[in-house]
C-alpha cells in the first residue's frame, strides 16, 4: 500500500494564521491530521512551513495569498516548483472555497484524526461558514485552510446549462 499524499494549507487573515494538514490515501476518505493556529505573524508560519517541507519533501503546500500570504510566499523564496501553489483568487472567485467545504461535509469525504486539539474550533468555524459563507470572523482562517487542504486543486468541471 502506498503512502498517502500529504497536503498542507497555509492561511493568514486578520484574526491569525492556520496550517491544516490533510492526508489523501489511495482509497477512502481524506483525514485531517493536524490543525495548527498562529498569531498574525509571518515569521513563525514561514519557519513551520519550511519544517513541514523538510520533514515531508513530497508533500503539497498551498498558500493563500490573502492577509500575510503574499509575504509568506515571498519569504519562502518563491517556491514555484512542483508541490507548491499560491492561491490567488479574490472576491467572488473565492466562493469556490465554500463550495468545496459544503460538498465535502455533505459527502463525508473527510474526517478528523482522533485527538486533534483544534478540532472543536474547526467544527465551530464550519458551522459559522454554513450559516454565513462570507464570514470573516475568528476561525474563518481555519475553514479556508481546511478547504484548501482537502481540495484537489484541479480545474472545476464545466457547467452544463
What kind of feature is each model-predicted range?
Residues 1-87, 95, 99, 109-161:
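RNase H-like, metal-dependent nuclease domains and their acidic two-metal-ion catalytic environment used
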